[in-house]
């Protein structure tokens, strides 16, 4: 499974990338607002830190305007992945962009039917939103499961990018089902390492080692 971080905070991105665990970054207009920086400036810096795909989202809703914004975003860096909404115009733009060799991430996916269309349009990634479905009492993991089954049925190469991930359990369940990628906030990715027995065991080992009076180096 690939790990993407869902943020436009350069400090968090750099910290996670230095761990060697980061495969890419996803951003959106809300995260750019939170970062409080110019979209081109911050996206360019992110692309210089991370070698993998960096999703930058168009804000236009009509095909020709989407293509114009996509052209501008793609000039920022070679590892830009154009993020598009799952609408008819977004799918049309996806088809055109992938045909031209661009990476694409079709976002705001809430149904298997939508995911099927994204794959037909040649999307590099499709982003089903787990947490937002959970919010309306629909099991978001069921959607990941359905998409995985459909893509496997037909051999689609579109990667399932599990999004709106809020808990470490979301990450585990997505991995068990077979999502190709998970994108999560920095805090959620860092929380994956945590377990009380790990902390307790380390504390015991260190206490016992101190009693030996030895040093390794």
From Swiss-Prot:
Signal peptide: none annotated. Belongs to the transaldolase family. Type 3B subfamily. Its main location: cytoplasm. It is found in: Cytoplasm. GO terms for biological process: carbohydrate metabolic process; pentose-phosphate shunt. It comes from Sinorhizobium medicae (strain WSM419) (Ensifer medicae). The keyword Kinase does not apply. This is Probable transaldolase. The active site is at residue 83. Pathway: Carbohydrate degradation; pentose phosphate pathway; D-glyceraldehyde 3-phosphate and beta-D-fructose 6-phosphate from D-ribose 5-phosphate and D-xylulose 5-phosphate (non-oxidative stage): step 2/3. HAMAP family: Transaldolase_3b.
């Amino acid at each position: 499974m690939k790990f993407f971080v869902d943020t436009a905070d350069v400090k968090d991105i750099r910290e996670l990338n230095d761990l060697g665990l980061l495969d890419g970054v996803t951003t959106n207009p809300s995260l750019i607002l939170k970062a409080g920086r110019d979209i081109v400036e911050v996206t360019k810096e992110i692309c210089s830190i991370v070698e993998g795909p960096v999703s930058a989202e168009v804000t236009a809703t009509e095909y020709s305007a989407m293509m114009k914004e996509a052209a501008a975003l793609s000039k920022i860096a070679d590892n830009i992945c154009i993020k598009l909404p799952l609408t008819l115009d977004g799918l049309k733009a996806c088809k055109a962009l992938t045909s031209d060799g661009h990476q694409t991430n079709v976002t705001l996916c809430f149904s298997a039917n939508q995911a099927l269309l994204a794959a037909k349009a040649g999307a590099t990634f499709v982003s089903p939103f787990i947490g937002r479905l959970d919010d309306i009492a629909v099991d978001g993991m069921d959607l990941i499961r359905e998409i995985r089954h459909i893509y496997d049925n037909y051999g689609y190469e579109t990667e399932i990018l599990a999004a709106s991930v809020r808990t470490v359990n979301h990450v585990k369940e997505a991995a068990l089902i077979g999502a190709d990628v998970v994108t999560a906030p920095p805090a959620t990715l860092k929380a994956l390492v945590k377990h009380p027995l790990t902390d307790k065991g380390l504390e015991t080992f260190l206490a016992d080692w101190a009693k030996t009076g030895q040093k390794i180096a």
